């Protein structure tokens, strides 16, 4: 454990600290210096992978246009007829009886989680899992995409307010003498309890049925930093939303992976706001990944898109690839998932455009980042961990030095990386990145076999001193209160 010197402690705590405070400080320091190890990668010990989750198989079927997707070790189509894929996404109509309201207010499966039999839902969900994931040894990504309501009452705003309105009506219809205050309280409690049970038991069933699969909910966690057009936009997650994410510990404890999303807007193209938006969303997910009852950090797979939210067929610029995919890799994500819908395959022209992008800017950048992550893992972490930024907010990336490497593209869209890292390249990596060791390994370079009662993960860098100080001071003040 790394211990602060007496002088450093004086910078943090300037008043006398009681014995109980010192004990709390000890445990805080121990928890920081012993971060949870990373779960072993799902594919050939690759520290960072790119997954493909778009229906581009239709390009071959409809237009005889084949995309070279060899750079994606994990591939799946979101189409309903697709089965047995190593990326399986469950929309509302593919997993049990998810309750929701249409935009016209028509209830589907009861509309509210309070109105549906959980047992009946789970029985149908079990059938759906067996249909869409027939292999019992499935070890891919299992993503549940349920977006109509959120399990926390306070987060059901705007169009989702219908779930609060209907929950209130459900309570008021039960008795005429219930006060407005009681209606609000009971509506909130019954909705949240039902929503929690619905989501928790569903993912529990998935993990029980396919225990090797990386089960998680799409868009969880969310940072809710969508005010990207605000003056002086920082990208940071609002404090209330961070606290609400903390309250979802039951969801993180139930999950096997996290699937945040960083879809961005063309109207912000190449701007610092896209970088800020992505950076804080991924960082929040990395924070949540260590807050569970698991003895390892949950793997984070970041959903992104080929194009922009406001212009889906206008594909990401080179800078925005860095601000999304590059940020995800540098912050320690296990991979990215590139999602697309049927618009990508609506015409031969669209398919051709996708093929050109994959075989040029996108493919080249993915080859660059994934190889750089491998090089860093091999040389800094002995292939027993992945590299993450020492300072999470620093502008450092897992990129190959063009003076040392060359990326060649073949005519059919396959990429080959040639070259070798120089001593200077490795020194730069060592200065800017540290190792997040996989389960079973520890030490600065992850060479040591983890002992039963030892620590593993990331050792705090000198730049973490301010964070340590703030935590120490906060703990002292809380005890004094």
From Swiss-Prot:
pH effects: Optimum pH is 4.5-5 (for chondroitin sulfate hydrolase activity).
Transmembrane portions of the chain: 9-29, 454-474
Membrane side Cytoplasmic: residue ranges: 1-8, 475-481
Any one of the GO CC terms: cytoplasmic vesicle
SUPFAM superfamilies: (Trans)glycosidases
Reaction catalyzed: Random hydrolysis of (1->4)-linkages between N-acetyl-beta-D-glucosamine and D-glucuronate residues in hyaluronate
Alphabetical GO biological process terms: carbohydrate metabolic process; chondroitin sulfate proteoglycan catabolic process; glycosaminoglycan catabolic process; hyaluronan catabolic process
Segment forming the signal sequence: none
Protein's job: Endo-hyaluronidase that degrades hyaluronan to smaller oligosaccharide fragments. Also has chondroitin sulfate hydrolase activity, The best substrate being the galactosaminidic linkage in the sequence of a trisulfated tetrasaccharide.
UniProt protein name: Hyaluronidase-4
High-level lineage: Eukaryota, Metazoa, Chordata, Craniata, Vertebrata
